[in-house]
């Protein structure tokens, strides 16, 4: 039986993973598969169970379901998963549906029974650790959730924050340019209000610090994704991050690096929204701007405290899926390659590998099981190949993850970048010409390879030879990404070989 080279390589690399740890330095080398627990996999293994995103109801995904599909995730080369919040939610079916997503919590000391039991969550953690993989859990410290108007909240339903004293006075955010409003007023609306905890109060602060340390300890969690970070005052976060004792990455939903990057001074990392917007715009059409992406790579690298601890993505449950803008598979391949080979920690959202095309919430929260989990889809294989070369480069080059990605070339339709220590660098060439793009040879300078050196293009498994002038003649066709690595360094890796 022929087995894909990336499958052989990834299996060998991950089974041999070292003992687990959960420091920021350890997370630099991870690659994250993000999933909504309710929408990824069911305990019964069904691939036909109905899940109409417009209904906004629980669809039946569970922690046990995730355990049963870890081969599917690990087969793409992911070393970690990020799951949505685990706390008990408001029980009602609101006018906006159920709290299937996990962001409308009411009891932080109980688990969401729709996903399973405490033993199930512990089993998920153990199953990941047995594979050398990490568990990241989503947490919310900013707010609770209530089925009703902000002016008529019954605070007694919240545990342990069971009185109005724990919360900011009711007011909805009207002006997002006013940081005081952003922090002190409420998200939500009068259909589902999100009572905003007053995290300046020691009693609230200490409760959260105790809780997060216990959560991490009880379920052997390796990292946290923190929701709505910009809605809590900055001085709350260092103590929270310290109490967690693991890598924390925060959601600061703002594309301005001058606003977003400073949050990395109060927690380990943030989601890279500054890159998200120019990345999306560069590849969502064949007329996108490479200039803006090129410039933002350099801005984030220079202005953020540590770009190697940011989370790179183009899809999540809050933003429309990439394929909702274009169904061009070549463009989707380029954007996925960027995510995995840029600085920081790659994050791929469940369903992205199957070219899901849901638009705004709730359409972008499709059930992964309805795809049937095929492992031969074009994006599944592309993601596996890109993760494989990244994982391999990390295993061979101790400086790879801290080397700052360097854009070395751009034109109207192309961007090229290099990452890694001299002699072991990966050079990635991305195009937004799309699947109908012409065939041509790009003469690439600045790659840092030596004249006459043989390179392997690890997506298509072809080779090129560096010219006598040091330029690399890169064959481009069909708008596809090219990822180069020194051929001699691949010896024994199984990359670009079959058995």
Curated annotation (Swiss-Prot):
What Gene Ontology terms describe what this protein does at the molecular function level?
alpha-amylase activity; calcium ion binding
Gene3D superfamilies the UniProt entry points to: Glycosidases, Golgi alpha-mannosidase II
Q: How is the cofactor bound?
A: Binds 2 calcium ions per subunit. Calcium is inhibitory at high concentrations.
Assembly behavior:
Monomer.
Query: Which BP terms does GO give this entry?
Result: carbohydrate catabolic process
Q: Which residues are glycosylated?
A: 218
| Record EC number | 3.2.1.1
Can you tell me which family this protein belongs to?
Answer: Belongs to the glycosyl hydrolase 13 family.
Q: Which cysteines are joined by disulfide bonds?
A: 51-59, 171-185, 261-304, 461-496
Residues reported in the UniProt entry to bind substrate = 56, 104, 143, 225, 230-231, 255, 318, 365
Task: Write out the residues that bind Ca(2+) 2.
Answer: 227, 251
Source organism per UniProt? Aspergillus oryzae (strain ATCC 42149 / RIB 40) (Yellow koji mold)
* Region forming the signal peptide: 1-21
Q: Which keywords accompany this UniProt record? A: Calcium, Carbohydrate metabolism, Disulfide bond, Glycoprotein, Glycosidase, Hydrolase, Metal-binding, Secreted, Signal
Q: Give site residues, Transition state stabilizer.
A: 318
Q: Name the chain's protein.
A: Alpha-amylase A type-1/2
What domain of life does the native source organism fall in? Eukaryota
TM helices/strands, residue ranges: none
Q: Coding gene?
A: amy1
What's this one used for in biotech?
Answer: Used in the brewing industry to increase the fermentability of beer worts (including those made from unmalted cereals), in the starch industry to make high maltose and high DE syrups (starch saccharification), in the alcohol industry to reduce fermentation time, in the cereal food industry for flour supplementation and improvement of chilled and frozen dough, and in the forestry industry for low-temperature modification of starch. Sold under the name Fungamyl by Novozymes.
Sorted alphabetically, which InterPro entries does this protein's record hold?
A: A-amylase-like, A_amylase_C_dom, Alpha_amylase, Glyco_hydro_13_cat_dom, Glyco_hydro_b, Glycoside_hydrolase_SF
Which reaction does this enzyme catalyse, per its entry?
Answer: Endohydrolysis of (1->4)-alpha-D-glucosidic linkages in polysaccharides containing three or more (1->4)-alpha-linked D-glucose units
Localization per record? Secreted
Binding-site positions, Ca(2+) 1: 142, 183, 196, 231
**Chief localization class?**
secreted
- GO CC annotation: what is one? extracellular region
Q: Which cofactor does it need?
A: Ca(2+)
